[in-house]
A protein has these predicted regions:
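Substrate-binding cleft of secreted/luminal carbohydrate-active enzymes
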Residues: 233-235, 241-341
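Substrate-binding surface in catalytic domains of secreted glycosidases
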Residues: 150-252
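C-terminal motif of bacterial Sec signal peptides marking the signal peptidase cleavage site
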Residues: 15-16
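Sec-dependent signal peptide recognition
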Residues: 2-8
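Hydrophobic faces of well-ordered beta-strands that scaffold small-molecule active sites
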Residues: 25-29, 50-54, 84-90, 131, ...
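Catalytic domains of carbohydrate-active enzymes, especially glycoside hydrolases
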Residues: 37-61, 122-123
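Active-site beta-loop-alpha junctions enriched in small/polar residues
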Residues: 30-32, 57, 91-93, 136-140, ...
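Chitinase-like catalytic core of GlcNAc-active glycosidases
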Residues: 60, 64-182, 188
């Protein structure tokens, strides 16, 4: 009986002492003009961030030129703080890989590397250790996308640097058709997982049901080392006559809380527009689904992920660095999320 008691105690001690990841919190910077704003930089200091993921540009296919071209590249009005390393991020529209062959992907890889190097210097940095490629690849584009990644790795300007990619939930579950990118690590994008265009009450930014469906039985077996990206953003999804009409960048917390403009449905995230609102291109009768993220959402998501991610050094990246978004979360809130890993 004594031996059984010791065994039971040992099991409980083992379960209670599950090894934790060493988490390095930081942010994405997704604006087109980098300014070293005191309030935003204070968040980097507050969370002892050592790096910042900075969107350098989008890449899309230009039908007139018949070439992939840079879209809205960032400019640096200020240098990035000396104590912060830059991790450049390039977003590539998936359709690009349906339009070009492997010879063109080689040219694109070379141009991206040179463009990134120039932008990193504009940011006040002489070098960088990691380049991240953001692309929601599919079964149809994976071969050319993976070839492009191989071409990047072979570029002499990237010698000694690592390449990471973004990873969506469907690419984890559908690993056979999606394949595994030929890179050192990926970052799991835990947002934009619901059906944005479907009319209804769902929060398309973060949906626990979708996470269960796509990750519960698959995440633990994913072969790459994984960092994690979590959302802290909010947006206004507009519907007209029950049909998706877009995301309005002119609707924020001030507008959605204006009772002369909107009437919130009871116990709902749907808001009816009471008058025409030309400043946002909206008409009376339009419906806005106001989607936002709470501390409780982040806590439940981080707890869920911690069950299936192996303990290791891991970047935890919040999307994105913006004072208006971060004011919804206290330092204590964020520290609790970090502690869950």
């Amino acid at each position: 009986m004594r031996k059984i008691s010791i065994l039971v105690i040992s099991v409980f001690l083992f379960l209670g002492c599950k090894q934790k990841s060493i988490v390095h919190p930081t942010f994405y910077y997704w604006k087109t003009d980098y300014q070293n704003k005191k309030e935003e930089t204070s968040y980097l200091d507050q969370f002892k961030s050592k790096s910042l993921y900075v969107r350098i540009m989008d890449v899309d296919f230009n039908p007139d030129l018949q070439l992939p071209v840079p879209i809205s590249p960032i400019k640096f009005s200020d240098p990035i703080p000396k104590q912060i390393d830059i991790i450049p991020v390039v977003f590539i529209v998936n359709e690009v890989f349906n339009k070009i062959d492997t010879m063109q992907t080689a040219v694109m890889a070379d141009r991206i590397v040179k463009f990134v190097a120039a932008k990193v210097k504009q940011a006040g940095k002489q070098n960088y250790a990691e380049l991240q490629i953001d692309c929601d690849w599919t079964k149809g584009t994976r071969n050319r996308y993976f070839k492009f990644l191989e071409q990047l790795k072979a570029n002499p300007l990237l010698k000694g640097k690592s390449i990471s990619v973004t990873l969506r939930l469907h690419q984890v579950k559908n690993i056979i058709s999606s394949g595994v990118p030929p890179v050192e690590k990926a970052i799991l994008m835990c947002y934009n997982m619901g059906n944005l265009r479907k009319y209804g009450e769902q929060n398309s930014i973060l949906d626990q049901h979708e996470m269960d469906l796509y990750l519960k039985d698959y995440l633990e077996r994913y072969p790459l080392s994984l960092d994690v990206a979590l959302p802290i953003f909010e947006w206004a999804v507009v519907f007209r006559n029950g049909q998706y009409a877009g995301i309005s960048k002119r609707i924020g917390t001030t507008q959605i809380g204006d009772k002369k403009l909107f009437k919130q449905r009871e116990n709902s995230i749907l808001y009816d527009l009471l008058v025409d609102y030309p400043a946002a291109g909206l008409k009376k009768g339009d419906v806005v689904r106001w989607e936002q993220i709470s501390t409780e959402d982040l806590l439940s998501t981080s707890k869920f992920l911690s069950r299936y991610l192996s303990p290791r050094d891991r970047n935890l990246v919040f999307y994105h660095l913006d004072t208006d978004l971060l004011k919804h979360f206290t330092n204590e809130d964020v520290q609790k999320v970090i502690a869950n890993f």
